[in-house]
Amino acid sequence: MSALKFVLICGLVLLLIETIPGVSLNLMRATNRHQCDTNDDCEEDECCVLVGGNVNNPGVQTRICLACSRK
């Protein structure tokens, strides 16, 4: 039961930190970006980038629009 309390307390602390104006841990940053297939699906100052997983474990990967400089 103490492990459950620990998880709940940590979750509440993270939630409080995220709600402080000007402070963000970017926990939801990727989900706020829209998905894309090519750079044409993104704004002019964004690029379509493959995110998620790593070399040893590809896991779940998706393409999202992130800020970049395209010329």
Curated annotation (Swiss-Prot):
The presence of a 'disulfide through disulfide knot' structurally defines this protein as a knottin. The cysteine framework is VI/VII (C-C-CC-C-C). GO terms for cellular component: extracellular region. Keywords: Cleavage on pair of basic residues, Disulfide bond, Knottin, Neurotoxin, Secreted, Signal, Toxin. Expressed by the venom duct. Disulfide bonds join C36-C48, C42-C65, C47-C68. The lineage of its organism: Eukaryota, Metazoa, Spiralia, Lophotrochozoa, Mollusca. This is Augerpeptide-s7a. Elicits an uncoordinated twisting syndrome when injected into C.elegans, but has no effect on mice. Residues 21-29 form a propeptide.
